[in-house]
Amino acid sequence: MVIFFDIDGTLMDEKSQILPQSAADAIAALVEKGHIPVVNTGRPYTHIDPRVRALPFAGWICAGGQQVRLGERWLKNETVPMEWMPEIIEAVRRNNLQVVYEAEGGFYLDGAYSDKHPEIAIQSALIRSIGCYVRDVEEGLDHPVVKFCTFDIPGSNRGAFIEVVKQWFDPIDRRGMAEFLIKGNSKAAGLQLVLDAIGCPLADTMAFGDSGNDLPMLKAVGTAVCMGNGVEEAKQAAHFVTKSVMEDGIDYALRHFGLL
């Protein structure tokens, strides 16, 4: 069986960034039993915590399906064309949004358009803690942007911003923020690339997730598992709701389905 795992809120506790030992042990045990574990995350590949990188995953679906890697081979690695960036940056500023541009190797922020939402400071500290850079767009874009997120503050007009960029991106609404993936990408599209490459039917798949950007993945697989700490929409899309991350939810669900 091929089993897909989100990272934040699924493999790792999103706030504390703790990776439960039970989850790490479960991934190793799946491999020993002949199953194929694959990461399926919204994070770009270079933003993945080294503790997760050290686990024996067979594949990596990153940036919501824009980057897909099987073993040492890239099946897909799609970044935002540099010529789009001036219009995106100008539209963010005009519509008073807060923004994080998630690039290869780190974050680009945008001065006053990235310093008013507390989540940006939290995410910037986390990305620095794993060796990634945090720079300002005014210093120049030395690395390609993979995807970006906007955060609402009083006076933001996200709707007007989406009208500008909808020709290029599909937004994912995440309660006061939005994640922007290049059109045609999703966690479900990414996992299908992996399945096509290894010749596995959807019926022989399972996925673990917790949030809104996991919905395409949860709806696509044969067996969908939502973490106990997940959002209500993800729970409704799942076949089984397990315990929370910190209650060893990964291990609990895999044992429930007889995979460990």
Report each predicted region and the residues it spans.
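Phosphate- and divalent-cation-binding pockets in alpha/beta enzyme and binding domains
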Residues: H47-P50, A160, G190, P216-M217, ...
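Conserved acidic, metal-coordinating active-site core of Asp-based
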Residues: A91, N95-F208, G212-A220, N229
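Short hydrophobic/aromatic-enriched beta-strand-loop microsegments
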Residues: F57-G64, D170-D173, A224-G228, T242-K243
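Asp-based, Mg2+/Mn2+-dependent phosphohydrolase catalytic module
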Residues: A220, A224, G228-L260
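Short, structured coil segments at secondary-structure junctions
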Residues: L55-P56, G64, V164-W168, A220-V221, ...
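Short, flexible loop segments at the rims of nucleotide/cofactor-binding pockets, characterized by
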Residues: E14-Q17, P37-V39, N77-E78, L126, ...
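Asp-based phosphoryl-transfer active-site loop
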Residues: M1-S16
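Active-site phosphate-binding/coordination module
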Residues: I18-H117
